[in-house]
Amino acid sequence: MPGFIPGIHVFFCAPPEMPRWELHPQLARDTVNIGDLPLARVLVINDANWPWLLLVPRRFDVSEIIDLDEVEQAQLWTEIARAGRALKELTACDKLNIAALGNVVPQLHVHVIARRQGDAAWPKPVWGAVPPVSHDRYEVDRFIAALRKKMWLVG
């Protein structure tokens, strides 16, 4: 038998399956999925107080930006900039708040929030400032359609 070496046994095993990426359950509950960029899933937070996006890299078991390799880090910043530009163009906001906190939800996610001087929390952070307000279905659908167009989202 060609290639056979007496006394040596070789067993071929299938490579281990990579764990499937899944969105953290709390993020799934609190958001609407609007599409995917090359690295990150783009979500809208279910709170009409602010135009508020989340970008969640579709990578398993990543909790910090530094857990991504350098190419993915650069890609994430490119996608954050794309989200920020879209929000700024659509809302004419005064300031973008961009943050990756992860104190409550360990899965890496980046908040991109459009702020206006005089909004309900200005100039403080939005978290816990006022109770969340549900989106008007028609308004959020229009906003999502505009975001998809501006960001060239696949979804």
Write out the residue ranges for each language-model feature.
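HIT superfamily nucleotide-processing domains
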Residues: 10-155
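A cross-taxon signal for low-complexity, glycine/charged-rich
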Residues: 6-7
